[in-house]
From Swiss-Prot:
Residues 17-326 are lumenal. InterPro entries: GPI-anchor_Adhesion_Reg (IPR052479), Kre9/Knh1-like_N (IPR018466). The keyword Transport does not apply. Keywords: Endoplasmic reticulum, Membrane, Signal, Transmembrane, Transmembrane helix. Pfam families: Kre9_KNH. Residues 116-176, 243-278, 289-322 have a biased composition (Low complexity). Residues 348-349 are cytoplasmic. This is Uncharacterized protein C553.10. The lineage of its organism: Eukaryota, Fungi, Dikarya, Ascomycota, Taphrinomycotina. It is found in: Endoplasmic reticulum membrane. The chain crosses the membrane at residues 327-347. GO terms for cellular component: endoplasmic reticulum membrane; external side of plasma membrane. Residues 115-190, 243-322 are annotated as: Disordered.
């Protein structure tokens, strides 16, 4: 019994829907019409969708052609604006589901054909309006029997052939649009203020020149957070041995410490306290330039301002000393006269 069932299944598959044309190695041109032919049996689907599939590219490109009545056994398609190349195949599948294939043709080639005459192009353009209704109605699979659909197939053959022209034209234009590329101007983005609420992964070991700050989200910022050996870093986390200034030496800190703002000449930063899990919860960090020349200039400026401040302080000190000295160096005669009159007045009283 099992053998009989397997044999019947083999016969059914052999008699199922199959495509006769195009055959292997056929060459179709893009300047006219080509005919697709197939065989069906009474158990096959009453309608099927025709798809043009290109296996020469990856992933394969599937293009919808039309939905046909399978009992007709043939369909004439307009190949105008079809893609050219090798490895093309016609598939008959369930409408709207190109992966549910009923039958496949052998692979064939498509080449560029000569330009069509003006009369054929004008007739093709004039049939676009009349083919709109027929193409929309043929998009759904037929539910009638094969006998009733065969009587109406001859009347709708011309409208289907004309609608394929408009569909292939629109598909060609959509393909052209999809291959266009848009050029974008490259620009470097460097914000002056770097606000953050929750940033993790900011531990850095042996960081040089401070190109990365706060892990993944701090690219191109000149700061070193929680670094054990940071050279030429502008910012650092409070640690056991942090040297004030531009360079941070042997800054070994934990995530429980907070960033402290040093004087301007020390190039430091103020943020809020970090949590134990290593997330900076609140704060705003100023992003400085990574240009060492700018930092050197700032250090020179700060050094100059410190020198000028010390000079002004020494000048002020010297002026105070000179004014005190001038008070001491007043003429002694005036003091003596005042003392004499005071003694005389006391004796008189």
């Amino acid at each position: 019994m099992l053998f009989k069932i397997s044999f019947l299944a083999l016969i059914a598959s052999a008699l199922a829907m199959s495509i006769n044309s195009p055959t292997n190695g056929d060459t179709w041109q893009t300047n006219g019409e080509e005919q697709i032919t197939w065989n069906v049996v009474s158990t096959d689907e009453p309608s099927a969708a025709l798809y043009l599939t290109n296996f020469a590219v990856y992933p394969t490109v599937t293009q919808y052609l039309d939905t046909v009545d399978t009992s007709t056994g043939s369909y004439t398609t307009n190949t105008t604006n079809w893609p050219t190349g090798q490895g093309f195949q016609i598939n008959m599948a369930y409408p709207g589901r190109p992966e549910q294939i009923y039958a496949q043709s052998q692979q064939f080639n498509i080449v560029e054909g000569a330009a069509s005459s003006s009369s054929s192009s004008s007739s093709s353009s004039s049939s676009l309006v009349s083919s709109t209704t027929s193409s929309s109605s043929s998009a759904t699979p037929s539910t009638t029997s094969s006998s009733s659909s065969s009587s109406s197939s001859s009347s709708s053959s011309s409208s289907k052939s004309s609608s394929s022209s408009s569909k292939s034209s629109s598909r060609s234009s959509s393909r052209t649009t999809s291959h266009r590329t848009t050029s974008h101007k490259s620009s470097s983005y460097r914000p002056t203020v770097f606000p953050y609420t929750t940033i993790s992964h900011y531990n850095i070991t042996n960081a040089t020149n401070g190109t990365y700050c706060n892990g993944t989200n701090g690219t191109n910022f000149t700061c070193i957070v929680n670094a054990s050996n940071a050279t030429n870093s502008t910012f650092w986390l409070n640690g056991t041995n942090s040297t004030n200034g531009t360079n941070s030496t042997n800054s070994t800190s934990t995530t429980s410490h907070s960033l402290t703002k040093l004087p301007t000449s020390s190039k430091s930063l103020t943020t809020s306290k970090t949590t134990a899990s290593g997330h900076i919860t609140k704060g705003v960090m100023e992003a400085l330039s990574t240009n060492d020349t700018t930092n050197t200039t700032d250090d020179a400026t700060n050094t100059t301002s410190d020198s000028s401040s010390s000079s002004s302080a020494s000048a002020s000190s010297s002026s105070s000393s000179s004014s005190a000295a001038s008070l001491v160096s007043q003429p002694v005669g005036i003091s003596a006269v005042i003392a004499f009159f005071a003694v005389a007045l006391s004796l008189t009283l």
